[in-house]
Amino acid sequence: MRILGIDPGLQTTGFGVVDIDGQQLRYVASGTIRTTSLALGDLPGRLKILFDGITELAARYQPDAAAVEIVFVNVNPQSTLLLGQARGACITALVASHLPVAEYTALQMKKAVVGHGRAAKSQVQEMVRRLLHLPALPGTDAADGLGLAITHAHVGPAMGRLGAATPLNRRQHAMYKGGRSY
């Protein structure tokens, strides 16, 4: 199974692609999508860069599923709203690419990757490096994307066995494709 992990951000969105075969994780790719070439006020342009970038990643790597970080409520409500819009562009691109989308909080990802939810970014980077046998630490945004993919590799199958649905389940995907399911 191939999983695409996305750490959304309006200026920098991290991504990671991981294959899982049984309990074996294998690194495929990671990096960032940057929108900093545009002015801060060009929100529609930045969202389009994110949408196009995620769509391209889905086409290039052909993942079976995607995992996206859930937005945390920031002290600054404007920042939270902007991050939510960036996240929406990412999720829309994934759904348009016909991918099932699971969502995890940063705390859930840190717990799955490091072992406790209050881990520092440097700890996430180091554990991602170890779990995927990387020669060097990935950047923080890419490490978060990889961490989300790893989280889904470990938690997603268990959720399926327990019958829990991801936020965008098959019925919802059918609705997005133009079908109806009640």
Swiss-Prot record:
Chief site of localization: cytoplasm
E.C. number: 3.1.21.10
UniProt GO molecular function: crossover junction DNA endonuclease activity; DNA binding; magnesium ion binding
Bound cofactor: record note: Binds 2 Mg(2+) ion per subunit.
Superkingdom of the source species: Bacteria
Keywords, ordered alphabetically: Cytoplasm, DNA damage, DNA recombination, DNA repair, DNA-binding, Endonuclease, Hydrolase, Magnesium, Metal-binding, Nuclease
Sites where the protein binds Mg(2+) 1: 7, 141
GO biological process: DNA recombination; DNA repair
Locations listed in the record: Cytoplasm
Presence of keyword Repeat: no
Pfam families: RuvC
CC cofactor: Mg(2+)
Positions of transmembrane segments: none
Gene3D superfamilies for this protein: Ribonuclease H-like superfamily/Ribonuclease H (3.30.420.10)
Reaction equations catalysed: Endonucleolytic cleavage at a junction such as a reciprocal single-stranded crossover between two homologous DNA duplexes (Holliday junction)
Binding positions (Mg(2+) 2): 69
Catalytic residue positions: 7, 69, 141
One GO CC annotation: Holliday junction resolvase complex
Homology family: Belongs to the RuvC family.
PANTHER family attached to this UniProt entry: CROSSOVER JUNCTION ENDODEOXYRIBONUCLEASE RUVC
Assembly: Homodimer which binds Holliday junction (HJ) DNA. The HJ becomes 2-fold symmetrical on binding to RuvC with unstacked arms; it has a different conformation from HJ DNA in complex with RuvA. In the full resolvosome a probable DNA-RuvA(4)-RuvB(12)-RuvC(2) complex forms which resolves the HJ.
Biological role stated in the UniProt entry: The RuvA-RuvB-RuvC complex processes Holliday junction (HJ) DNA during genetic recombination and DNA repair. Endonuclease that resolves HJ intermediates. Cleaves cruciform DNA by making single-stranded nicks across the HJ at symmetrical positions within the homologous arms, yielding a 5'-phosphate and a 3'-hydroxyl group; requires a central core of homology in the junction. The consensus cleavage sequence is 5'-(A/T)TT(C/G)-3'. Cleavage occurs on the 3'-side of the TT dinucleotide at the point of strand exchange.
Protein name as it appears in the record: Crossover junction endodeoxyribonuclease RuvC
Organism: Verminephrobacter eiseniae (strain EF01-2)
Gene designation: ruvC
